[in-house]
C-alpha cells in the first residue's frame, strides 16, 4: 500500500484534480493547451493556506483503508462506552432511589397464644381397618423475645479481679518424724515409707522441675528452721567429763517384768527384753554362765559389749522421751514445737551448748531440769540404752537372795510386815509372792549328764526360781505385797556433762555455711555408727561415740555440690522458661503476672508475704488429726488419705487448704468469710519442683515447691442472666435477612431491685467466671446518646428454621415460615403441653414441676426501622449500621449506607443475577422499570444464557484483565492516529 502524499504533492494533486474537472467540461481548450496548463500547475510554486493545511490533515487521517477502519473502530468503542455509561448512570440513579426508600419497622414485645387441634386416629375394636379421628387439644404458648435476645440463667458467679497475689510454699514430708510421733514399729515404718514414696513418685512423674522468680527458699530463715527442726529437733550430743563405761556385764532390774507368753495378764513388750538371759533347762556338759555372760546372772539382763565400751566419750541421742513435764504428749505437735523452741532459745547463748540449768541434777550439779527430766526407776525397762549410757549412778532393784546379805532367816527383821511369816499361818492370808525372794540360792552351779551324753545335760544354775513369777519384781515395785527389796547404788561416771543441741548447731551453722552443707555434714554425723540415730525408735535412739569431732567440718563448697551440679545446671538451662515454651508447656495460666508475685505495696501484706508463716510446712503440721493417738496402721491409713488428696488437688492445680493457714491470710487481707470462700475456690496452685531429699529402707523425705496464685475479688456478681442473641428475620426486596442487634452487654445482673447490664473483658473460667474488667453499660433504645447499638444483617436462604431447646423445657424458635401457628420472622419461646410436630421436629412438653421464673429481664421498648435494601446490602457486603430508637436519625444511617453502596462495583459477579437483583430492588419503587430489568435478566439467564449470559458472566469475572488489555490497545490506537498528523518536518 502506497504511503500518503506530502503536503506539496497533495496540493499539486488537488489542483490537478480541479484542473482535470475544469478542462473535461471545456471544449475550447485544445489538448496541447491542457498539457501546458498541467505543466504550469506542476511547476508552480505552492504556498499552502490554512485551509489547505486543514484539508490536508483530514486527508492524512483517512488516506488509506486501514486508517478508515481504525476510525470506525474508535467510533464504535466510544459509542459502546457512551451507551454503557448511560446504562450505568440510569441504573445507579434507580439504585439510589431504591436506597432512599425506607424499609420495614421491627417492633418487639408482642405476646401471642394459639391453640390448634391436630387429628389423631383411634381404632375401633369391631373393625381393625376402620379408624376415626379423635381430636386432642394441644396448647402452644408463644412469647416473643424483646429485641431478639433471650436471657437464660447464668449460674456461675462473676468475680471482678482487684489484684492477683503470688505466694510460695515448701511442703516437707519426712516419714521418720511421722513414725516417731505415731510410735510405729519398724515394719510399719517401712510400709509408711513405701506409701509416701509411691504417692510422691506418682506426683513427680507428671510434674516438671523449673524455677520461678521467687528467690531460693533455702536462704530464708523459716526454711532453715523447718529443715533443721525436721531432721534434728530432738537430737543432742552429750559429752562425758571423763570417759567411763558400765562397770559390770550384768544389769539388775527386777522392777521390769520378764518376757514370754504367760496365762492371764500380758505386758507390753519392753526394750530391755532384748538383753534378757533366759534360764535353759539343758546345757552342754560343764557349761558355765560366767564363761559366756561374765558376771551377768541367768534370769536377769546383760549389758552388750557394743554399749559397754571403756573409750566412749560422747553419747548421741535423738529422742523426745527425756523432756520434762513441759513437753506433754497431750499437747498438739505445734504446741510442743513452740515450747521446745522457746526453751532452746532461753537455754543457749549464741551456740549449740545448753546451759547447765537445762540438765537434770544427775548430769550436773547446777542442773534444774529446765529441759530434761530425771531418769526414773522404770526407764531402764523401756530405755535401757539411756540408763546404761547416760546414768551417772544406778540404783539396782533386786529381789535375789544374797543381795544386801538378805536371807530367808532375816526377812522378819528386814521387812516388818513379814515378821513371823514362816512360823504361823499368816502367809495363808497374804499374796502368794509376799515375803519371798525372786531368785533363791543353790549350793553351786553344775550340770548333770547321762552316761555318754555331752550336749544335753540338766543344768542347775547358782540362783534359780520358777518362770511363773515373771512379774514378781514389777508387782513388788508397785508395793502390791511386802518383799525383801535390795536397793544398791552404783556409781557409773562423773557428773558435769556438756550437752549440745544439733538443732541449734544446724540453725546457726546454716547462716554461715548454707543449709545444704550443714545438712550434709550433720546427717553424716548422725550416721557415725553406720545407722542413722534419728531413724531408730525414740526409746532406743542412744549410741556411744569415741571422740567425735563436733561441730563437724563444713566443707567450703557451693550449694550445688550437694544438690548435684549437673541437676542444678539442667534446671537452669533445660528446664527454664524458654525450654518450657519449646516443649509446649505454657505457664501463662499458672504465672500470669510475675511482677505480682511479691505484692508488698499493701501495708497489711508487707510482713505477711515476706514472713509467710506457712511458707514452709511439714506434713505433721497439716494433718487434720493428731496421729500420735492412733494405732500404727490407722496412722498410715490416715496419712495415706491426706497424701492422696494432696496429690489429686495438685494435679488439678487446686490448693489443699489443709496445708495453708487461711486464718492468717484472712487477717492480712481483711476479708469477710464469704469473700474468703471465693478466694479459696478460685485460687490456683502450681508445683514447680518435687524432689526426694532422703531415702532408706525405713525412712524417706520429700520436698514439694508450691506456688499459689490468689485472686483477690473486688466485687462478686450473683444472680446473673446470660445473653443469647437469636435475632430477627426480615423479608425485603426478595431477600431473606437475619438481623441481630449487637447489644453492648453479655450479662444482666439483678441485685435487690437494681438491674445492671455488664460488659465483660478479659475473662476466664475457673469454676467461677473471673474477669479483669467489668463495665456497667446502658441497654439499647433508651433515647440517650450512649444507647445506640450496631445492627448486623446477614443474608440467609429460605426456608430458614432455627430451633434451640432451652433448659426449662421450652424451645426457642426462629423461622421464615409458619407452622403450628407459630408466627414467622419473630423469635419466640414455644411451650407445649403434649408432644407435637412442628417444622418437622418433635416438640415435647417440659417437666411437670416446671415453673416460670420469677424474674424476667425487662428492656426498653425499641422500634427499629431498616433500610429497604437491607437484604441486598447484607448479600453484597456485610455492612455495620448503627440503630437508634428515633426515626429521624435513621436517615443519617441510610445516607452512610447509600454512600457505601454507591462505592461498590455492582457489576461484579453474574450479570444476569445482578440485573434480576436490581429488578427485585426496584419492584417496590418503579414497577415498570423493574419489569423491564426483570425481562432483560430473564432473557440473559434463560434463552440466551448460553451465549450472552455465560459470555457476560465470563466478561464480568475477566473484567480487570479485559479492561487492562482494552486500555493498552486504545492507547496504541490513539498514538497511531496521532502519528498520522503531519508535523512541520513532514510538511516541509
Swiss-Prot record:
A motif (Endoplasmic reticulum retention signal) lies at residues 984-986. Residues 1-15 are annotated as: Involved in virion budding. The record marks 126-127, 571-572 as: Cleavage. Envelope glycoproteins are synthesized as an inactive precursor that is processed by host furin or a furin-like proprotein convertase (PC)-mediated cleavage proteolysis to yield a functional heterooligomeric complex. Further proteolytically processed through regulated intramembrane proteolysis either by SPPL2A and SPPL2B or by SPPL3 in a PC-mediated cleavage-dependent or -independent manner, respectively. The transmembrane protein and the surface protein are N-glycosylated. Pfam families: Foamy_virus_ENV. Glycans are attached at residues 109, 141, 183, 286, 311, 346, 391, 405, 423, 527, 556, 782, 808, 833. One of its GO terms (cellular component) is viral envelope. One of its GO terms (molecular function) is protease binding. The keyword Transmembrane helix applies. There is a cross-link at residues 15, 18, 34, 53 (Glycyl lysine isopeptide (Lys-Gly) (interchain with G-Cter in ubiquitin)). The chain crosses the membrane at residues 66-88, 961-981. Residues 1-65, 982-988 are cytoplasmic. The mature envelope protein consists of a trimer of SU-TM heterodimers. The N-terminus of leader peptide specifically interacts with Gag protein. This specific interaction between Gag protein and Env glycoprotein may allow particle egress. Foamy viruses are distinct from other retroviruses in many respects. Their protease is active as an uncleaved Pro-Pol protein. Mature particles do not include the usual processed retroviral structural protein (MA, CA and NC), but instead contain two large Gag proteins. Their functional nucleic acid appears to be either RNA or dsDNA (up to 20% of extracellular particles), because they probably proceed either to an early (before integration) or late reverse transcription (after assembly). Foamy viruses have the ability to retrotranspose intracellularly with high efficiency. The ER retention signal plays an important role in establishing the intracellular site of budding. The surface protein (SU) attaches the virus to the host cell by binding to the cell receptor. This interaction triggers the refolding of transmembrane protein (TM) and is thought to activate its fusogenic potential by unmasking its fusion peptide. This is Envelope glycoprotein gp130. It comes from Simian foamy virus (isolate chimpanzee).
Amino acid at each position: 500500500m502506497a504511503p500518503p502524499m506530502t503536503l506539496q504533492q497533495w496540493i499539486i494533486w488537488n489542483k490537478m484534480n480541479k484542473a482535470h474537472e475544469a478542462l473535461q467540461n471545456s471544449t475550447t481548450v485544445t489538448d496541447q493547451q491542457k498539457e501546458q496548463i498541467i505543466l504550469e500547475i506542476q511547476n508552480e510554486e505552492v504556498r499552502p493556506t490554512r485551509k489547505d493545511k486543514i484539508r490536508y490533515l483530514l486527508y492524512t487521517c483517512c488516506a488509506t483503508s486501514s486508517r478508515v477502519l481504525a476510525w470506525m473502530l474508535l467510533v464504535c468503542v466510544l459509542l459502546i462506552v457512551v451507551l454503557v455509561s448511560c446504562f450505568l448512570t440510569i441504573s445507579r440513579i434507580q439504585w439510589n432511589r431504591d436506597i432512599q426508600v425506607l424499609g420495614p419497622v421491627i417492633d418487639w414485645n408482642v405476646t401471642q397464644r394459639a391453640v390448634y387441634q391436630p387429628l389423631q386416629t383411634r381404632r375401633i375394636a369391631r373393625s381393625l381397618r376402620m379408624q376415626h379421628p379423635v381430636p386432642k387439644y394441644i396448647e402452644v404458648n408463644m412469647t416473643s423475645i424483646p429485641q431478639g435476645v433471650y436471657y437464660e440463667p447464668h449460674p456461675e458467679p462473676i468475680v471482678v479481679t482487684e489484684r492477683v497475689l503470688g505466694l510460695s510454699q515448701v511442703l516437707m514430708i519426712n516419714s521418720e518424724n511421722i513414725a516417731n510421733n505415731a510410735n510405729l514399729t519398724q515394719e510399719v515404718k517401712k510400709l509408711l515409707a513405701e506409701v509416701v514414696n509411691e504417692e510422691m513418685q506418682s506426683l513427680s512423674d507428671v510434674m516438671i522441675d523449673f524455677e520461678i522468680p521467687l528467690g531460693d527458699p533455702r536462704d530464708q530463715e523459716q526454711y532453715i528452721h523447718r529443715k533443721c527442726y525436721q531432721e534434728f529437733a530432738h537430737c543432742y550430743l552429750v559429752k562425758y567429763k571423763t570417759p567411763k563405761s558400765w562397770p559390770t556385764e550384768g544389769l539388775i532390774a527386777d522392777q521390769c517384768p520378764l518376757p514370754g507368753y504367760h496365762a492371764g495378764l500380758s505386758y507390753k513388750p519392753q526394750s530391755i527384753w532384748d538383753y534378757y538371759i533366759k534360764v535353759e533347762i539343758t546345757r552342754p556338759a560343764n557349761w558355765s554362765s560366767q564363761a559366756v555372760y561374765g558376771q551377768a546372772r541367768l534370769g536377769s539382763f546383760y549389758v552388750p559389749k557394743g554399749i559397754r565400751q571403756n573409750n566412749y566419750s560422747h553419747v548421741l541421742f535423738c529422742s523426745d522421751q527425756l523432756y520434762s513435764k513441759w513437753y506433754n504428749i497431750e499437747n498438739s505437735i505445734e504446741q510442743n514445737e513452740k515450747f521446745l523452741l522457746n526453751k532452746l532459745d532461753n537455754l543457749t547463748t549464741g551456740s549449740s551448748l545448753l546451759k547447765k540449768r537445762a540438765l537434770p541434777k544427775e548430769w550436773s550439779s547446777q542442773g534444774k531440769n529446765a529441759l530434761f527430766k530425771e531418769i526414773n526407776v522404770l526407764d531402764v525397762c523401756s530405755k535401757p540404752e539411756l540408763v546404761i549410757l547416760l546414768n551417772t549412778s544406778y540404783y539396782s532393784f533386786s529381789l535375789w537372795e544374797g543381795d544386801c546379805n538378805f536371807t530367808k532367816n532375816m526377812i522378819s527383821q528386814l521387812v516388818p510386815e513379814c515378821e513371823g511369816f514362816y512360823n504361823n499361818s499368816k502367809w495363808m492370808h497374804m499374796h502368794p509372792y509376799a515375803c519371798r525372794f525372786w531368785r533363791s540360792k543353790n549350793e553351786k552351779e553344775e550340770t548333770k549328764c547321762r552316761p555318754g551324753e555331752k550336749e544335753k545335760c540338766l543344768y542347775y544354775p547358782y540362783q534359780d526360781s520358777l518362770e511363773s513369777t515373771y512379774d514378781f519384781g514389777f508387782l513388788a515395785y508397785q508395793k502390791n505385797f511386802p518383799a525383801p527389796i535390795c536397793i544398791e547404788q552404783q556409781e557409773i561416771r562423773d557428773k558435769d556433762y556438756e550437752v549440745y543441741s544439733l538443732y541449734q548447731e544446724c540453725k546457726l551453722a546454716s547462716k554461715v555455711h548454707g543449709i545444704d552443707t550443714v545438712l550434709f555434714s550433720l546427717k553424716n554425723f548422725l550416721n557415725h555408727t553406720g545407722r542413722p540415730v534419728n531413724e531408730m525408735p525414740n526409746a532406743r535412739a542412744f549410741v556411744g561415740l569415741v571422740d567425735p569431732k563436733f561441730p563437724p567440718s563444713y566443707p567450703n563448697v557451693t550449694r550445688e555440690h550437694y544438690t548435684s551440679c549437673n541437676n542444678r545446671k539442667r534446671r537452669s538451662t533445660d528446664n527454664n522458661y524458654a525450654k518450657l515454651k519449646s516443649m509446649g508447656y505454657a505457664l501463662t495460666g499458672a504465672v500470669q503476672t510475675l511482677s505480682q508475685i511479691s505484692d508488698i505495696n499493701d501495708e497489711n501484706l508487707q510482713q505477711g508475704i515476706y514472713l509467710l508463716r506457712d511458707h514452709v510446712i511439714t506434713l505433721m503440721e497439716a494433718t487434720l488429726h493428731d496421729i500420735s493417738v492412733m494405732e500404727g496402721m490407722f496412722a498410715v491409713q490416715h496419712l495415706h488419705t491426706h497424701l492422696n488428696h494432696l496429690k489429686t488437688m495438685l494435679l488439678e492445680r487446686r490448693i489443699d487448704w489443709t496445708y495453708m493457714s487461711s486464718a492468717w491470710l484472712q487477717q492480712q487481707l481483711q476479708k469477710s468469710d464469704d469473700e474468703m470462700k471465693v478466694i479459696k475456690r478460685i485460687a490456683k496452685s502450681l508445683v514447680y519442683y518435687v524432689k526426694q531429699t532422703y531415702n532408706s529402707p525405713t525412712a524417706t523425705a520429700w520436698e514439694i515447691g508450691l506456688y499459689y496464685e490468689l485472686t483477690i475479688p473486688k466485687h462478686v456478681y450473683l444472680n446473673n442472666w446470660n445473653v443469647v442473641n437469636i435475632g430477627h428475620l426480615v423479608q425485603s426486596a426478595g431477600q431473606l435477612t437475619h438481623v441481630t442487634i449487637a447489644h453492648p452487654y453479655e450479662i444482666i445482673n439483678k441485685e435487690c431491685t437494681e438491674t445492671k447490664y455488664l460488659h465483660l473483658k478479659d475473662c476466664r473460667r475457673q469454676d467461677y467466671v473471673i474477669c479483669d474488667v467489668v463495665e456497667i453499660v446502658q441497654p439499647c433504645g433508651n433515647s440517650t446518646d450512649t444507647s445506640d447499638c450496631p445492627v448486623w444483617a446477614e443474608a440467609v436462604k429460605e426456608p430458614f428454621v432455627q430451633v434451640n431447646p432451652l433448659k426449662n423445657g421450652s424451645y426457642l424458635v426462629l423461622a421464615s415460615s409458619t407452622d403450628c401457628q407459630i408466627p414467622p420472622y419473630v423469635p419466640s419461646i414455644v411451650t407445649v403441653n403434649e408432644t407435637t410436630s412442628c417444622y418437622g421436629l418433635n416438640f415435647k412438653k417440659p417437666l411437670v414441676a416446671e415453673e416460670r421464673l420469677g424474674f424476667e429481664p425487662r428492656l426498653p421498648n425499641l422500634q427499629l426501622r431498616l433500610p429497604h435494601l437491607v437484604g441486598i446490602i447484607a448479600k453484597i457486603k456485610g455492612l455495620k449500621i448503627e440503630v437508634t430508637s428515633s426515626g429521624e436519625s435513621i436517615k443519617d444511617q441510610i445516607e452512610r449506607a447509600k454512600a457505601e453502596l454507591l462505592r461498590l462495583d455492582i457489576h461484579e459477579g453474574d450479570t444476569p443475577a445482578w440485573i434480576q437483583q436490581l429488578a427485585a430492588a426496584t419492584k417496590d419503587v418503579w414497577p415498570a422499570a423493574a419489569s423491564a430489568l426483570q425481562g432483560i435478566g430473564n432473557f440473559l439467564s434463560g434463552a440466551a444464557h448460553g451465549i450472552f449470559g455465560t459470555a457476560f458472566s465470563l466478561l464480568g469475572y475477566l473484567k480487570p484483565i479485559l479492561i487492562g488489555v482494552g486500555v493498552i490497545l486504545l492507547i496504541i490506537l490513539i498514538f497511531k492516529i496521532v502519528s498520522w498528523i503531519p508535523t512541520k518536518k513532514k510538511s516541509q
